[in-house]
A protein has these predicted regions:
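Sec-exported extracytoplasmic/periplasmic mature domains
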Residues: 65-69, 79, 83, 98, ...
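Short, structural beta-strand-to-alpha-helix junction motif
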Residues: 56-61, 74, 88-98, 103
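Hydrophobic membrane-insertion alpha-helices, especially the h-region
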Residues: 7-25
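Primarily a LysM-type cell-wall glycan-binding module
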Residues: 43-67, 73-80
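Non-cytosolic head/periplasmic domains of membrane-anchored proteins
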Residues: 91-171
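Ser/Thr/Pro/Gly-rich low-complexity linker/stalk segments immediately outside membranes or between
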Residues: 28-48
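Short, Lys/Arg-rich N-terminal segment immediately upstream of the first membrane anchor
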Residues: 1-6
Length: 171
């Protein structure tokens, strides 16, 4: 049996668009980011969102939807004073704290969220800098282990008021 170019073209198109249609019908075809962090799969925290999966593209509102941390708490912890905290993107923190000389960004938010919610977070071989305002909130909450407190004491820095991001926060 020989296959000419016309039937082959039809077969290719049917396979391509049929596959897309089938995937879409089954709910597997997703073309947008869902902003949902992965969850712990085993142990005491199974089924809960994992703060280690927070990405720079997440907003404080996205974090609030996945974790029990209000956007206003995150804004207070990281010195965000302008605009709606729910729309503030985590990746804007690095630009805000750039002049301080400290790398305060996504990793800092991950650590803050983990400690604030009591979820596990591995800091082995990491030096995650936290602003004093964030550490003060965590210490006031009072659910930290002695090891977590020691880590925060070692990596907490006092920074001046951060420079607002170049793009204003959408209101």
């Amino acid at each position: 049996m020989t296959l000419t170019s016309k039937p082959l073209a039809v077969i290719v198109l049917v396979m391509l668009f049929g596959g897309i249609f089938f995937s879409s019908a089954m709910g597997w075809w997703v073309t947008e980011s869902t902003k949902e962090p992965v969850t712990f799969t085993e142990g005491e925290f199974a089924g809960q969102a994992n703060p280690a999966d927070i990405r720079g593209s997440y907003t404080f509102g996205d974090i609030a939807n996945s974790f029990e941390v209000a956007p206003e708490v995150l804004a207070q912890a990281f010195g965000i004073t302008e605009g709606d905290p729910s729309g503030f993107a985590v990746n804007e923190l690095e630009a805000m704290y750039l002049e301080s000389g400290y790398e305060i960004g996504t990793a800092s938010v991950r650590l803050f969220v983990a400690h604030y919610t009591g979820l596990p977070f591995d800091t082995t071989d990491q030096e995650i800098i936290m602003p004093k305002s964030a550490t003060d909130i965590l210490l006031a909450k009072g659910n930290l282990s002695p090891e977590q407190i020691a880590y925060l004491e070692k990596y907490t820095v006092i920074v001046d008021t951060p420079v607002p991001a170049e793009q204003p926060v959408a209101e």
